[in-house]
């Protein structure tokens, strides 16, 4: 795929990130090696790529289940279902990508195991803990302190907060190249001293998970203004202004078209109201309105 055709898929203001993504693809394609991104990409990027791109497998990882921000790998078929020599050459930490001493002809199921266990994306999961007995700490406190180190947001994944007795901990995957810098330089969150440790991510079952409030909404259609109006309990007339001023994002991109039809699985961020996922289509009412299960991130 030519670079100009690739970049055309994404908003102009995201051309820098799109170019870096294309560079990873180009390296993987030209040299028949795996190409990783250092950056974590939002859904407006990885949704467009799908599972394959121009003969390469596209594998994403954001550490957490259902993560929004994900690093992306472009993987040639030879690394998943090639010949015995390729598997043996790619052996990592004493492990070969051969099952039962035989080539893998049908690698559909193997691809999942390959993704999770056979190579490590260039990220580390940090646990940042502070004493929370004397005030409430929010996402913005953790992110503000991290970005205060002049770290770009795209080099960090999703942030999940967990209350742990007298402490609150922020779990966040970061690009491997900035891990040591954060551990060395991040001394506090707000005015609270912090402790930082690297968490082993091999056991996905012990990792923190997102918390949601579920809400079943009924709307005339999946138009953006209709959904935002129902979520916020504001009239459709009143939600037009924040939409047109760029205060509503769909999959992390400002959306100023109030008539846009929003798909199930999309993320809607409404400044001042929070972030929501259109999770499940629950069918229609007797009057023909649409019922949608919406999950609000908490």
Task: Identify the meaning behind each predicted range.
Residues 245-253:
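Short, structured beta-strand/loop micro-motifs enriched in basic residues and often containing a Trp
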Residues 242-243, 262:
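Short, well-ordered loop/turn sites that connect or cap secondary structure elements
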Residues 1-225, 231, 254, 261, ...:
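Ferredoxin-like alpha/beta domains used as RNA- or RNAP-binding modules
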Residues 228-229, 235, 247, 264:
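Internal, well-folded beta-alpha domain core
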């Amino acid at each position: 795929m030519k670079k100009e055709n690739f970049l055309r898929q994404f908003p102009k203001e995201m051309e820098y990130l799109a170019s870096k993504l294309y560079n990873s693809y180009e390296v993987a394609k030209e040299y028949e090696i795996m190409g990783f991104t250092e950056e974590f990409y939002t859904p407006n990027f990885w949704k467009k790529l799908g599972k394959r791109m121009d003969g390469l497998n596209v594998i994403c990882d954001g550490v957490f289940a259902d993560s929004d921000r994900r690093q992306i790998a472009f993987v040639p078929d030879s690394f998943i279902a090639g010949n015995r020599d390729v598997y043996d050459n790619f052996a990592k930490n004493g492990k070969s990508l051969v099952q039962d001493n035989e080539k893998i002809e049908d690698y559909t199921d193997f691809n999942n195991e390959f993704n999770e266990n056979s190579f490590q994306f260039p990220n580390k999961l940090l646990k940042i803990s502070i004493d929370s007995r004397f005030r409430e700490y929010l996402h913005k406190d953790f992110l503000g302190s991290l970005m205060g180190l002049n770290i770009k947001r795209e080099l960090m994944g999703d942030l999940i907060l967990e209350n742990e007795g007298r402490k609150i901990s922020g779990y966040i995957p970061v690009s491997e190249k900035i891990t040591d810098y954060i551990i060395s330089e991040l001394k506090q969150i707000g005015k609270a001293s912090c402790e930082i440790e690297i968490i082993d991510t091999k056991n996905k079952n012990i990792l923190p998970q997102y918390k949601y409030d579920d809400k079943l909404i009924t709307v005339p259609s999946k138009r953006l203004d209709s959904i935002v109006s129902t979520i916020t309990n504001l009239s459709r007339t009143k939600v037009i202004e924040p939409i047109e001023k760029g205060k509503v994002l769909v999959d992390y991109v400002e959306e100023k078209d109030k008539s846009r039809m929003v798909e199930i699985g999309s993320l809607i961020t409404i400044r001042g109201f929070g972030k929501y996922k259109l999770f499940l289509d629950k069918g229609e009412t007797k009057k023909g309105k649409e019922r949608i299960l919406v999950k609000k991130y908490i």
